[in-house]
Amino acid sequence: MNKNFFVERKLEAVEKALTRLSPFASNCCLCPRHCRVDRISGHTGICQTGDQARVSTSLLHFGEEPVLSGQGGAGKVGGSGTIFFAGCNLKCLFCQNYQLSWLNQGHPVSDEQLASFMLKLQAQGALNINL
């Protein structure tokens, strides 16, 4: 089987998942808070996330465990391709990413922009994509 066969199967699986998940965007219950907000209409719930992802930054991250970031293992030092999203529903008191999670510091990105971040990280040698 060729590479295109697998790419097509993955794309079909993604489209199927999006079809199944799309009703939740207008009656959000994706997290345990079940806020039922209509994100499609531009409203936001506890997580402050609307109809688009908000990204704070996208970079190669070397602060993860060596098995993820590649440090010290078989000569791989590519880093973990990390995309930091803004907004969170947990509201942990000792959150290490308070500015991103609680203050929602980030920029709305389209699906295409998010995909381009991932491709750029891959081109930079990321060993994985860490969301």
Regions found by a protein language model. Give the residues of each.
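Conserved Radical SAM active-site core
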Residues: C47-L131
